[in-house]
Amino acid sequence: NKIKITATSTGKVPNTSATAASSGSDLNGMAAKNAAEKIKSRMAEYLAAEAQIKPNEVSFEDGKVLVGANDYNFSDAVKRCYMGRISLSATGFYSTPKVHWNPKTLKGRPFYYFAYGAACSEVVVDLLTGENRILRTDILHDVGKSLNPAIDIGQIEGGYVQGAGWLTTEELVWDDRGRLLTHAPSTYKIPACSDRPLDFRVKLFSEGENCEETIHRSKAVGEPPLMLGTSVLMALSHALQAVNARKAYPNLNACLLYTSPSP
């Protein structure tokens, strides 16, 4: 109740970035932490000087500030600093460390960390019409120490369904002049709610913990689940293989580029 987050605005925060992709907690969260640590340091220095102790003897715990023998509510400690003319605002900044890449040698570290996931999908296919359904999907995903399990599970479900649609119903079609015809959801098929697995089971890896420094050792999971949609493509291929006594896997040509609409 004591923390309020406003809409992103360069009128309030210069050079701000949007909350998109997998940047919410990793970038914006760490920048907010950086700003909070600056204010915390100022408060500790002022309160320590007031009590004639060292700043490292000031601790912030459970809504309280312990200053030597004194025990203040956080709001009271803030008021003391305010009356002492201590700045209680700060700008935080964070850029992902350890990331580097050489496009010439194709070597480096393009990612700060990895979020791992596994999916198993069961499908049914009408061999006469090609109509198919996802009967069941089981997913286990690593999210580090989850900040909000409900949000993480929702991200995983959405990313998976998007990936399944990318590999089964979306199609890139150009005309003879090279213009993209399927340029928006109005011109290509995206998954609907009815296309999600009839039995959808998602679990978070309970023993996960980010080895890199992030907010509470969490991991972003906005984009990684997209690739789990490949389990649907492989399941469809496996189902079609049954027609040929499992002698060979058929090539489904997922994500190929076409110059004219399919018949």
Task: Give the ranges of each region predicted by the language model.
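C-terminal catalytic domains of large/alpha subunits in multi-subunit enzymes
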Residues: 1-260
